[in-house]
Amino acid sequence: MSEQGLREIARDGLWRNNPGLVQLLGLCPLLGTSNSTVNALGLGLATLLVLVCSNAAVSLVRGAVSEAIRLPAFVMIIAALTTCIELLMQAWTYELYQILGIFIPLITTNCVILGRAEAFAAKNGVLRASFDGLLTGLGFALVLLVLGGLRELLGQGTLLADMQLLFGPAAETWKIQIFPHYQGFLLAILPPGAFIMLGLLIALKNRIDESLAERARAQAGDVPASPQRQRVRVTGVIE
């Protein structure tokens, strides 16, 4: 794998083609489980593991699977890996598994995972496919984590609450009370609040992309960094 190729994969997975902010895939778990940091992190890590393993597995068997049964075979691979993650969560983080509920088995139908298996893993080697799964999964998990953190902060005035559900009793002290006497903001932890927060994150990303594009054009000398507006007289003559 060339360094340039790895950079392109990383840039696409984390920012340029982020599954949550650009492709808008996996919105059901993205909005349904991001009401707290621990829920978002738990689902993000589970999705990341399935994505990396499924990309690697699909890349390994791509030559042995015919076109006629390719998609069903990919779904079976993803379902088997999701079941493994589900059993691990039942064994080690059972309370968090109960909270996340149906969203863990629904990883099987997550369009992010099936999309990367079909579009990338089935056409590339194991290392490239695994790296793509890692960076795409990280991009999805980071959006989940930011969304969960913002919603928890606005909804409850805390950060990292109940992290012991994922990391054990030692994480009980990780909770940060940002606003000591905060009464809470119910909308932030409800589904409408998730839609609003996600929309704001998408708008912020688009604004950053526009600023970077303008700066790049200015440095290339195509357009001035801050073009002056032309004023038009009532006669129609431009000053």
Curated annotation (Swiss-Prot):
Its EC number is 7.-.-.-. GO terms for cellular component: plasma membrane. It comes from the Bacteria. It is found in: Cell inner membrane. One of its GO terms (biological process) is electron transport chain. It is a multi-pass membrane protein. The complex is composed of six subunits: RnfA, RnfB, RnfC, RnfD, RnfE and RnfG. Belongs to the NqrDE/RnfAE family. This is Ion-translocating oxidoreductase complex subunit E. It comes from Pseudomonas paraeruginosa (strain DSM 24068 / PA7) (Pseudomonas aeruginosa (strain PA7)). The gene is rnfE.
